[in-house]
Amino acid sequence: MLRNSVITPTPPAKNLASFVTKPTTDIMGYHDNTTRLSNRIDDIETWRETLEKTLADVDEEIRKLEEDKDLAERALEAKALPLDVASECKTLRDGRRDNDVVDDLANSEVGKEIDVIEGIKDALQAKVSSAFEQLCLLQEARQQLHADLRDKTEAKKIDTYCHDLTISSPDICYQPNSTRTPKGSTTPQTWEDFSRYNKDRADAEMRSSQRLREAIHSTVAQTDNDLEAQRQATEFALRKRIHEMKRAKDEDEWQKKNTEEEIAKQERNIRELEQAIKDKENPLKLAMTRLENRTYRPNVELCRDNAQYGLVNEVHEIQDSIKALEKKLQDAHNARDACEKQLYRINKDLELKNNSLDLDNKCMQVREKLTTGPVTQTMNNLSTFKTDRELYTAQRSLLA
């Protein structure tokens, strides 16, 4: 019976040795993969630190760009008053009349000032729009960094958990198909390239933002200088025109005074000539009466004697004198009429000069707003804004 029984042979000694050494191999694999997980955690943490710093830099750049965008917007708003003032000056000067409606230097500078302000507003608006677009790009880069950082934080959490698992951990168990390659898996190079791209993109957008902020400050400063230079040019032209108008007005007033004196003189002449002519009437009547009466002398007594010749000569002399006086009287009337016409033209010109002078003086009064009030307050706000920003930067440096 025993002979015929099936007896299971004992494993050879060599096979037993392989079974005995297998756990050692498993332990080595466990340690190797734990090391690999540790290295992977270090890699993730390195990128996390890099991305966190980049994210903080992006946040700071966004803050700075928002401040500079506000600066440009305030500078843009501050141009409303100069434009209103320049437009009001143009409207006032359009109130000039007749011969005073000339395209003088003041008119040219006021028109140029409006063009300069419009150009400044366009330049500042372009910078505001560029800042808005750049903020959108920075926000996109920030969101990508934040998403990448969030994923890496989650990946680190998972890998840290895996790293801390041991063969004695209660959470370990068999998993179905654990060696599968999950959908969407990437290579280490792709993983690194993705984060590097996010960082490089953020760095590029920050560089663009820094250049834009420099351009904003340069534009604000340059436009302020351009506006101030044009303001001075316009006001110089207006003051010069006011000076010229005052001189012209003084000349008109001097001519008016002389003309009025000449009119008074001619009117005195007219009165004197009229009186002189009147004074000739009775002597003429007398001489004519004598001549007429002597025509009634009878017969041979109607003699053309010396008295007759003397009376005839007297009548002729008086008549000639009256004609000369009447000629002078007419000349005096003509001179007075010419003076009155001249006086009318002078008064008309004075009215125009006074109107133009009044309008230009109103322009200068309106332009006082540019050196007091809202504009000054705006510049104070901009200075305060700059001071606050420098204070914030200093505080950040101290905290760092």
From Swiss-Prot:
Localization annotation: Cytoplasm; Cytoplasm, Cytoskeleton
Acyltransferase as UniProt keyword: no
Disulfide bond entries: none
InterPro entries: Tektin-like, Tektins
Main location: cytoplasm
Coiled-coil residues: 35-81, 236-294, 310-353
One GO process term, biological-process aspect: cilium movement involved in cell motility
The entry's keywords: Coiled coil, Cytoplasm, Cytoskeleton, Microtubule
Keyword Nucleus among UniProt keywords: no
A single cellular component GO annotation: cilium
Tissue expression profile of the protein: Cilia and flagella.
Any Pfam family hit: Tektin
Highest taxon above the source species: Eukaryota
Family: Belongs to the tektin family.
Function of the molecule: Structural component of ciliary and flagellar microtubules.
Quaternary organization: May form a heterodimer with tektin a or exist as a homodimer.
Protein name: Tektin-B1
